[in-house]
Regions:
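Radical SAM enzyme [4Fe-4S]-AdoMet core and its adjacent flexible, acidic
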Residues: 4-111, 115, 130-133
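Flexible mid-to-C-terminal extensions adjoining Fe-S/redox cofactors in radical SAM and related proteins
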Residues: 127-216
């Protein structure tokens, strides 16, 4: 009913998978069966001591689940039960501009977060983190040096990204996650990188299979 009420307006129904539901493909299928066509199921990002946190030893299970999701995704779309999974979207003909390919995260440069008391932070995830308050909208205080630091944070300043085959698809990942797990906005969060590459592998395979089918 919700999706129908949207009419031709865009929407996404979004969920999160954790260590407690690594069979997340079932959640995607359930949402599709309920009539939703625009679906996103995101991996949780939590400290490793949380019982819900995703850890590297879970990666084989998660990768297998993305493969299972991709196979069923192709089958359903081919059989007339079409739906779209956000992380399997890839535009091989147009895609983002060069700037977006080099810098995927706009925190602190393209946008900021403002708290109820007027404090400015690079994004909502940085709110309250020591050393990341950029100023206040109440007194026109603003840290332009920090702004420049975030604006310069891109593939060209991230050594670990320089040899990654997926770098121009993700643009270097999330600055907040990088800082939370490595202590440096220039050092990407390893789990995020590995999950991004796996999803991209699936997305490219799906695009190739569907293009080949369309050409026949």
């Amino acid at each position: 009913a919700f999706a129908k009420k949207r009419g031709d307006k865009s929407y996404y129904v979004r969920g999160t998978f954790t260590a407690r539901n690594l069979d997340f493909a079932n959640d995607v299928f359930a949402l599709a069966d309920a009539g939703f066509e625009q679906i996103s199921i995101e991996p949780v990002v939590l400290p490793s001591d949380s019982p819900y946190a995703l850890t590297e030893d879970m990666l084989p299970t998660i990768f297998a689940e993305y493969d299972r999701l991709a196979a069923e995704y192709i089958k359903r779309r081919r059989d007339g039960r079409w739906f779209n999974f956000f992380h399997f979207m890839v535009d091989l003909d147009h895609g983002p501009c060069v700037k977006k390919r080099v810098k995927g995260c706009g925190a602190g440069g393209e946008y900021v977060a403002v708290t109820p008391v007027g404090d400015i932070y690079p994004c909502h995830q940085f709110v309250g983190r020591p050393g990341f308050r950029m100023g206040s909208v109440l007194n026109e205080e603003f840290d332009t040096a920090m702004q420049s630091r975030f604006e310069d944070n891109c593939l060209l300043t991230k050594p670990q990204c320089s040899s990654c085959w997926a770098r121009f698809y993700c643009g270097g990942g999330c600055s907040a996650n990088a800082q939370a797990f490595s202590g440096d906005i220039r050092v990407p969060y390893s789990m995020e990188c590995q999950l991004e590459k796996k999803r991209l592998e699936c997305a490219l395979a799906i695009a190739a299979i569907e293009r080949e089918a369309a050409a026949q």
